[in-house]
Amino acid sequence: MGTFHSVFSRILRVEAERIGYSQNFTIYDDADQKSLIKAIIKELGLNDKVYKPSTVASRINMAKNNIITPDDYANDRAIMTRDFETHMPDVAKVYKAYSERCRMANAMDFDDLLTNTYLLLQENPDVLEKYATAFEYILVDEYQDTNAVQQKIVALLASRHNRICAVGDDAQSIYAFRGANIDNMLGFETAFKGTKVFKLEQNYRSTKRIVAAANSLIRHNMRQIKKDVFSENDEGEKLLLNMAYSDKEEASIVCSEIKRTMKKQGCDYNEFAILYRTNAQSRSFEEALRKSSMPYKIYGGMSFYQRKEIKAVIAYFRLVATPD
C-alpha cells in the first residue's frame, strides 16, 4: 500500500538498470528541480525574468504527466505556439537539457517516477508480466485526481487479472492545473470493460441545505456521472456567501463577522475558527486580526510572524529604527 510515487519508486529501485539508471538513483524534490532549471536557464542565456524556474518546471511536469518527451515537446506545434505566445519559445531547450542532466546525475524528479515506470512496463514485457501477475487486486483512491500517465500505468498493471477498484468523485476534480484528467473517471467504464458502478449517494457529514446547494451547482456540469446526493441530517442554517475582491478584504470581512456575531450572541473568541486552504493564506488573516486587536492561535502550522526568516527581517527593521 502506498502512493503512486512511493510504490513506483520501489519498483524502479529494483528495475532501474532496465531503463539506464543504477539502483541507487537520487530523487530530486521540487527545490532540487527548480535549482537545476535555474542553472540551465542561466547557462542558455535566457532571461530569468521571463523564464521563471517555477513556470518552466510546471510546464515540464505537465509534459511528463502526459508522457510528452523532450523531442515530442519540441515537435508539438500546439505546445510550441503556446510557448511562443507567452514569450518562452525555448522551454523545449530547457526541458531537453534538464532531462539530460538528470540522467547524467542518475537522478529522477517526482514526475520521472511516473513516466519512467510507464516506460519500464511498456517497453519490457517480462517486467510488466512480473508486476501485473504480482498485483492481483488494485485499489486506487481519489481516482478523479489521477493524470494521464497514472491511468496508463494502472491499466498496464491490471492487464493480467483485470481486478481494479477505483474510488472517487468526478464532482471533486479540482487538480486539473496539476495534470489531473477527469476523463480517467468519466471514461472508466469504457477503459475497463465489465465495470460495476456503486454510487455512494448519502452524505453523512453535511446538512441538507449544504448538500442541496452543492447539487444545484454540480447539476450544471455538462459531463458528469449522474448522482442524487442526499443527507438525512438536520436542515441546517441558511448558507451565507460573501464576495471579496482581495485577500485583505476577505480577512476584513471575516473579522467584521466575528465582531458582529460576538455582539449579537455574546460569544467568546475561542468559539470561532478560521479555516484556510494553504498556510500562505494565514498572513492576511493575521494582519486583520492584529489590526482588530483579536487574540488568535495558529493550529497545525506556524504563525507568519513566527517564521525564522520573518523574525530576522523584523529584528533588522527594529535595529534600524532604534539603533540604541
Q: What is each of the regions a protein language model found here?
A:
Residues 1-58, 68-72, 242, 256:
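Conserved P-loop NTPase-based nucleic-acid remodeling module centered on helicase motor cores
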Residues 3-6, 168-171, 178-182, 202-204, ...:
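A short beta-strand-to-loop transition that corresponds to the Sensor-1 phosphate-sensing loop
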Residues 7-15, 171-176, 205-206, 298-321:
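Short alpha-helix plus adjacent loop in nuclease-associated cores
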Residues 10-17, 175-190, 212-215:
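Short regulatory helix/loop adjacent to the ATP-binding pocket of P-loop NTPases
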Residues 14-28, 41-51, 71-85, 102-106, ...:
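Short, polar/flexible loop-turn hinges at active-site or ligand-entry regions and domain interfaces
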